[in-house]
Every structure is written in C-alpha cells, then in structure tokens.
Amino acid sequence: MPKKNKNKKNDNEKSILGRNAIFTPNVINDIHIKSQLGRYRMRGMALMKKIPHWDDLTFLPGTLTRFVIEGYREKCETKTVIGPNCKNPIKLDIPIYITSMSFGALSYEAKTALARGATMAGSATCSGEGGMIPDERRYSELWYYQCIQSRYGFNPHHAQLADGIEVFIGQGQKVGMGGHLMGQKVTDQVAEMRSLPSGIDQRSPARHPDWLGPDDLALKVEELRQLTKNKVPIQLKLGASKVYDDVRMAAKCDPDSI
C-alpha cells in the first residue's frame, strides 16, 4: 500500500489555521464569504457576535441632579407619561416598552403573547413593520402603530386605532440599514398584509421616501399629528449613532417623544 504523506493537510485542517478566540472558524468562514460577495451577507436571525445582557446594565445613582431616595423605606416611582400635551397621552407603569418587531419576523403566537405580557406589565407594544394584527391590537392596552420606510401594510385607518404613532428611522441591531425578511418567513398571511408575493425575500429601503432632511421630517410629523387629530403622541425611533446630533435634529421636528 502507498505510504500516506504526513506533510499533506486536508481541507478541514487548512481552514482552521490561524484561528483563536477572536478569529474562530465561523468568523474566518464569514470573512471568506464576504470577500467573494464583495458586500455584507444578507441573512435572517440575530447577530452572530455576543451583545450585552440585562445583567450588564448599571443604573446611574442619584447625587446632586437627581434627588436621592431612601430605598429601604421610600418608593421609587417608575410611572412614565409620553406626550403630555396630547389629548390621550401614553401612561406607562414602567419606563420600558416592547419595541417594534414585525409579524413575519415574529410568529402570530409571539406577537400576541408579547401584547398580553405588555398589558400585564403596564407597558406598551408596537406593531412593527408590515401592518396591524387585529388580535395584537385587541390584547394590547397600549399600542404603537409604526410608520416605516417601505410602507408595507401601512393603513391610515389602523393608525387611527393606535395609542401612539412611531416613525421608524433606525434600530439598535442595524443602524442605518433597511429591513430584510427572509422568504421562508413570508407566509401567505404575511404576504397578503404587505401586498407582496409569498415565499420571496422582502427588502425595505434604508431611507424614508417622504423626506430628505429635517424640514421634510417635521412636515411628516405634522401630517401624522393631523391624521390622529393630535390625540396620541408621535414618536421618532432612532438607532444609537451620533446620539447628540441626531437627538438635537429630531427634537427640532417637534415630536412628542424620541
């Protein structure tokens, strides 16, 4: 029998050369794919990298600018009012709400369960991209309707049923990028709500077609305010980027919350 060449390495051994705690086999493979594509990968699901956990959060204690309370005998008030100048401001028991996640990215069961949970916690939830699920609206005591770049599923009559309008500009997981819903998640029901063919990838643009700058955005905020007859707060949702500059510009557009 011919002798095996000990110096010859198989493909699997070659692919893992140079790996370490940072450059794992998955990371190296991802780099190879991106170099072949010439762009970032388009895929579903969450980020591959590790992100901070709830246990990593630290609440800033009170000193001079915030009056200190005696935690063992005084109650810390968490109630939050959004849009106090509106006819129907949103009143939360906690300063946290369930952010926008679309029907499609999440299942019907997940959306309705989050709606029930938000109501139990005295908080709010949001429609996300793609329009309204009637049962989500029914189970949500406080509910935001989202105005998004693609306009998929946007219905002004549904917006008038909301407790607040959220204008989507960015989100933490992918700041400055549009949406991408994998084809296997575009079921017949999702496709019908968004007026799209089922089973194909759905892309949303990174920019809104209704404005090019802060002046246009201010007009959009006013348009939504007139749509809802100034009954509910108009909220701008930003992904954290140039926070100081972005928040200053957003504030000039006169929303009820950012």
Question: What spans do the regions from the language model cover?
Answer:
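Conserved, well-structured core domains of diverse proteins
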Residues: 1-96, 100, 105-119, 123-124, ...
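Alpha/beta enzyme core
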Residues: 116, 152-258
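General beta-strand structural signal in soluble alpha/beta enzymes
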Residues: 125-128, 145, 167, 236
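Charge-rich, low-complexity amphipathic helices
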Residues: 136-141, 246-250
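Active-site loop/lid in soluble adenylation, ligation, and acyl-transfer enzymes
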Residues: 145-153
